[in-house]
Amino acid sequence: MIATFTLHATGQKVSAELKEIERKYLIHFRRPDKYEGEFGFDWMRDEYIEIIDSNIPICKTPEILEKHYEIRNFHNQKYYVPWLALLPFSTEHKYGSSINKDGANLNLELQELTELKNDGTKIVFKIDDKFSDVVKITPTSIELSEFLNEKVEVRNISQEDINYRVLKNKVNIKCLGVLEKNVSIKVIATKNGKEQQVGELILFKTNKIPKAKIILVKVITNDEPFSLPNDFEYALKYKSFNQALTRVEVIARNQVLDLRNRKEKTVVDFLYDLQSQRIKKDKIMENFKKLYIYFGKKIYENYIYLFYHNNEISLLDKGIIRKTKGFTYQGNIIINLGGLNTHTIIHEIGHALGLKHPFEEYENIPLFEKGTTDNYIDYEQTEYGTENPHKGKMFSLFKWQWDNIHKNKKLKFSYEDDYKSFWDIF
């Protein structure tokens, strides 16, 4: 831009080029406020690796954590790309589903790096043309001014105040078919023919949707009534493992192991030990399986058996006897009296599919403080007995958990859909 000035002393006119100050910002995709696990979404939360309002980071191994995210550099800022996973809404894909037929509504967050003004910049969402028929984003562009109309939110991150502006439920993303590989949605700021990337989202590939088969076994040891919650199968389908594009299917619901009034010494001794809480968890599972077979049933290797009963069980944990809601042993599950709820069932199925507690140390898996994340496999209490800040809203699975689930040997990747209504009719 050329500007002309008149010098007062001489009246001489002078021309000079004015350089416009570069406006810098980043745009992040984020989950909607009322998210309950309807689709997979994972991102590098600030609290994982930064000091938030004087609270120390909750991830103990940030160097491992970083390896699980794609990292970009925009405006000399480290940018962690979030992940989105949607079940393909397609009748042509044999694993197509109507669960995510409405797509995912996401928030957009603008992070200010410099002071901003309405300069006519447009924000465009770009998808490779090869995937334009399969991945749909609405709208395809917005004006920067839309952000500037929103109030500024200030967050103190690592002792620095960061300004954000949020457009809630601003974009909708749908997957309408098979993605043979992960697909990026790039966020491009455009003005006067110039482009600058300021954000990105990666859509998880949909070419493999494995299946896990669950067999429920009700173990009756007394006359007190008990049952599993009515909503847990819905949650398996709509609020949990769908995030990992994994089909967890209960194929048998009416299996019963009734141990009441049995005279066999094996049964009598086991019930005495069970009810007096004098038995280790491996022995509980061993006895349930042996008695299940003894009374005419079979144990199939590639199925997950979930035994549930109404006895309290206590286990030794770091020198302390604690009541346990449930546990997984050698790929099968036992749910005890205190665990007959949807969250515990999902937590234990996660273990059966190979997931580890995020607060226990394993090679190449990020380590977190106990009871600090919104992850299904975390605990509702911290190491110090205080409540997890996300209790009641622990609906997420990490992206690396999606990957780990797909490595589980009990899953089937090639199968004929003998239960075609699984995804669509409950």
Question: PLM features: residue spans?
Answer:
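A short alpha-helix/helix-coil micro-patch that ends at or immediately precedes a cysteine
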Residues: L228-E249
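Beta-strand-enriched, solvent-exposed domains that form extended recognition/catalytic surfaces
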Residues: I2-I209
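Residues that flank catalytic or metal-binding motifs in active/ligand-binding sites
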Residues: P210-K213, N242-A244, N302, T372-T373
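Low-complexity, Pro/Ser/Thr- and charge-rich linker/hinge segments at domain boundaries
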Residues: E200-F232
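Active-site-proximal beta-strand/loop segments in catalytic clefts of secreted hydrolases
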Residues: V217-T221, I251-R253, F307-E312, L337-G339, ...
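Short, hydrophobic/proline-enriched secondary-structure or compact coil segments at domain edges
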Residues: G103-T114, I185, I214, I299-N311, ...
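Active-site-proximal segments of metallohydrolase catalytic domains
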Residues: L245-G338
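The catalytic-center signature of Zn2+-dependent metalloproteases
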Residues: I333-F426
